[in-house]
Every structure is written in C-alpha cells, then in structure tokens.
C-alpha cells in the first residue's frame, strides 16, 4: 500500500514516524483559520507491485484539482537547454561571484573544447539586505554592468542559454521593506513576521510573479533556477490562508514562466505544496546538495536521488544536482548517475579542472545528452531498504534505447564491515524494464548482458554474480537478442543503447542510425558462431551491417 500526504485549498496533512514505529497523521491550516469539516487527508493506493501502484496513485492525484495542479512528466515539454550539458557557478564559487569571474570562466569554457551549452549563475549576485531581496537587479558592486556584458557572450553554437538563481520568496528570508520595486508591485506585497510577502489574494500574488519573471527575461535570461521553495510556506505560517497563499506562489511561478517561455528548474521544492503543483515545469531537485570530495554525503545523495525519483519522477525529470568532473572521490560515479537520471546535467568545477574522460561519455559532439526513456529508479529489492547500512548492493535501472535496460550496481555502505558486497544480475531483471513506465509488456526474450567497463558481453541465461569493493559502481546494459542481433551502441558513451536508432532488422541485415562518433558494438549470431563486432564510426550516419 502507498500513502502520501496532500494539500487542500487551505489545509496540509503530514505523516510523522514515532519512536515506537507507529505513524501519526496530522492535518492543519498552519495559521489562524479554522480547519474545515472536510479536507483532503491522504493519497492512498493498493496494487500488485510498487511501480504501478505509485504510478496509479499519481494518476488519481492529477485528476484531483482540489489537492493538486499536476501533469505527468511525459505530458509536459522539457526545456530545450536541459537536453544539453551545462555549467553552474555554485559548487566552485559558492556565493563569491562577480562579473569578471563569470566572464573569465565563460571564456575558459569556450576554449576548453567541451561543448557546454548553458551557464547557470547561482547565488551571490542578488541585491539584498539581511537576506531579504531589495530588487531584481544584481548587486552593483559585484556586477557593475548589470547583466549586459555577460549576455554578450551568448553564441548560438557555444553557450546558447544563460540561467539565473533566485528564491521563490525573493531571497532566503523574503522581500525587504527597503526595496526598489515599482509602486504597482509594492501594492501586491504585505508585511508578515518581519518580511514582505506577495499577497494576500491570488491576483496580487500573480502580479508579483509576472513582474519577477518578466524583469529577468528582459535582462536576457532563458531560464530560472528557483530555490528555497519549501521554505516559502514557513514564511506565511501563522497568518490567514497561509497554505493557500504559499500554494498561489507556486501556481503563479508555474503560470508565468510558462506564459513567458522561461525554463524553470525547481530546487529544494520537496514539500507537498511544491511537488503537487508543477503544472508546466519538468525538472525538480530530488536530493540534498552534492559536495565535492565528501564520500558519505555522496552516498546519501545517490540514495536520496534514486529513491525520491520513485515519486517525483511521475511528474518531473529528476535533477541530481551539479557535480565536479575532477572529484577524485566520486567524479566518475556522479557522471554515470547523472546520465541514467535523464535529468539536467551540469558541471561545477573550475573550467580549468575539467576531466574530459568523465564528461564526453555523457554527450554528443554538440553537447547534447544521451538520455534514457525514463528516469532511473531503484530495483524492487533496493526500494524498502537503507543501502548505507544494509550490507547489500544497491541496484538502480532505467529503460534505454533499442529495448535495452541500463542498470547500475552500487556499494553505498558506510560500515567498514561491508566494504565488499556481492551483487547479482538475473535474467528476470530485464522483465522489469517496462514496469518503470506504462509501456507495452516485454515478451520473453533472450538477453545479452554487457559490462560497460570491461566491454565484455555474454548471454544471460540465468544470473551473473560479481563483487563491489569500496565506494564503487558497475554499469551494465541488458539488451534483447533479436533475430541473431543485439545493438549495444557506441561504447564510449555511458548510455550506449541511446546512441543508436534501429531503422530495420532482418535475419541477415541490420540498418542503424548512429548518433555520434566512436566504436559501435553489435552482437552478431550466425549459425553456431557468436561475435561481438566493433565498428569504427567517424561521423554520425546511417549504416548497413550484413552478417
């Protein structure tokens, strides 16, 4: 059985797990209003397997306009920039940024030979007083030219898009009474608990976010990363219609970014009000922050990212956060996890420190990401467990191209007693491929197991067992054998099956559209002979292979 807290027009439920293992359900207005006699309490669904149960629960939630304003991930557009590799200022600079640093790094990125297509300017640019926003223009000391100089570095075939970080409520603690907003915008604000907030009615809140988005769009930005969303509700708490007003903030941001054709990356937006009101946006953070060189935090980050995707992945692509390609602790693991997530992938190292070997396997020559058909989620045995303490391997998978399933096995254990764990891949794992999404059932097929690291292939007739020593991962592709052929894809890319499109396949002939350069791997069976053929691809093209 699956149960999830929900919001009403001006009510919010939540679950608390007690010390004795019992669970308490709460519901409140979180303010001065009385709770109505009837309010939504829980989203509940029972089913035969966890994937279909959660999917059906969210389908029911999408139909309930009192509790949510949602569309499924597959029904929404995905912002074009997020299909490409990006770079973010945060983990390298934190909030110590200025105009010259950003411009110098954009120049270094362009000279690096790595096709990074968007730059995201994170916290550190805002005009504020006591962590309250004073205006939607950057700090004049740090950015004396405003955004004009930085925008001049946009190029159609280089850094094409630039995004900007803001908080849903303006800044961390809301809006400052000492602000430079136009009078018409000030009239849409009211004081509460030491801050100015948009409100109190829906029209005023919408007018504030119309100004918010249009001001940043006029300055040249293509998308916004809107952070601190979950803390907007606490800023409203204790007043009248606290939940309704906080919900209107999310609704208005969604409506205005959509209307003004601005991309939206939701960040720290995991409370019910945030998650259940993504009517247009299609990317949300699913974990704590990534921190370079921090092994324990990296393990928790991976665990959270995949587990939370079981829920959030119903309505958005998961954002696994930025990463450092030069991270000697987990740079390669992070790169592969971003690949299988299907969400935005953006670096955060100093551009001079980029490690190309961890970056190029993610993308084609234009910086376009190779993405799965659906986000990676935990395999059944890895769902109701804590892989940091389980003493077992943690397995996640996603459907990738040409009928393949891409699977990563991790050792995320923190105890020294479990530095070595055993992982098993079984043939029946492949039958779960279409359980992750509502796809047509997978027929009984022969399956090829391809080890990405060793570049070895074998038919998976029963199971394959291997060891995971220390904080590590192993990447595999489970590919169907059809008419004596298996298309694995371009070896140099993490998501090899997503690098090739099958045009036609007969007993003796295979026609493919190969999407990037590299070494194409194809398994071929002819009479009693089996061959893993390597074909050099010097340019993306259509090719014909004969047995």
Q: Can you describe what each PLM-predicted range is?
A:
Residues 80, 102, 112, 143, ...:
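Active-site-proximal structural scaffolding
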Residues 172-217, 251-358, 374-385:
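Glycan-recognition surfaces
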Residues 460-499, 520-522, 531-547:
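C-terminal beta-strand-rich structural cap/linker in extracellular carbohydrate-active enzymes
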